[in-house]
Regions:
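Active-site mouth of glycoside hydrolases
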Residues: 1-99, 105, 123, 133, ...
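Alpha-helical scaffold elements lining the catalytic groove of polysaccharide deacetylases
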Residues: 15, 19, 111-113, 118
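Short Gly/charged-rich anion-binding patches and loops
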Residues: 59, 115, 144
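Short low-complexity, flexible loop/linker segments enriched in glycine and/or proline
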Residues: 89-90, 143-146, 171-175
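Active-site beta-to-alpha loop of glycosyltransferases that engages the nucleotide-sugar donor
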Residues: 108
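Short, solvent-exposed beta-strand-terminating loops
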Residues: 155-170, 174
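Carbohydrate-binding surfaces of carbohydrate-active enzymes
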Residues: 207-222
Length: 222
């Protein structure tokens, strides 16, 4: 398709060996470091080049496993899952087959987030870590999503932290485009999209931080 017409940088023969060597050096250095919880072998495989990402995904998993790290490995399953448990494409099926746990991305509102999470836990008997979430514009909020993850005993990462040069406090262009195409779409552009703290290190919303602290404390008691 047109969106996959360009080359990924690892598809250039002069670049790929450098990339693989870098990956090997990093894993060798930290493979027994207890500060590393897990290895995300590839972020959102297939997003850039579709099924052409599968050979690289297999190579990277083989390389990292050959180095015998103490930590588990995963690649993101981020298109979601059908309610019958079927993964949506060959890239996701490959990522799941190679992974030790499910690395799940979702910026969906509560109902869709819960449906996907329930389906993963029902059909795939592996730990789940939500490695990307929080999109207030799309009603994926700390108030609704964080307590749900705690109750379901699902780990999570909030990749953004302080308002900065990534500008992810602002909605992605794709959200603006959807809103322009459909004025009735249910986005709230009055809110920050992402990040938890302002440049002055005060919380964007102190209530969010209190929720995170409160539910972390409850989780510690389990």
């Amino acid at each position: 398709t047109a969106e996959h017409a360009y080359k990924h940088y690892t598809e250039y023969p002069e670049i790929k060996p450098i990339f693989m060597e870098m990956a090997e050096r990093v894993v060798k250095k930290y493979r027994a470091d207890n500060r590393i919880l897990a290895w995300n072998i590839e972020n959102e495989p297939g997003a850039a080049i579709g099924e052409r990402s599968i050979p690289l995904l297999r190579e990277l998993f083989a390389l990292v496993r050959s180095l015998d790290p103490e930590q588990p490995l995963a690649a993101d399953v981020y298109w979601g899952v059908r309610e019958n448990g079927e993964l949506k494409n060959e890239v996701e099926k490959t990522a799941y087959a190679l992974s030790d746990f499910i690395s799940f991305h979702s910026y969906s509102k509560y109902e869709k987030f819960l449906t996907d999470l329930y389906t993963f836990k029902k059909y795939y008997k592996r730990p789940v870590i939500v490695t990307e979430w929080l999109n207030r514009c799309n009603h994926n909020t700390v108030q609704e999503i964080y307590p749900l993850m705690m109750i379901e005993r699902v780990g999570c990462y909030c990749w953004g932290f302080v308002q900065g040069k990534t500008y992810t406090t602002e909605p992605w262009d794709g959200l603006w485009k959807k809103a322009e195409e459909n004025p009735d779409v249910d986005f709230d552009f009055t809110k920050w999209q992402h990040e938890l703290y302002r440049k002055n290190f005060h919380p964007y919303d102190p209530k969010e931080i209190n929720i995170i602290k409160r539910f972390n404390a409850l989780a510690d008691k389990k």
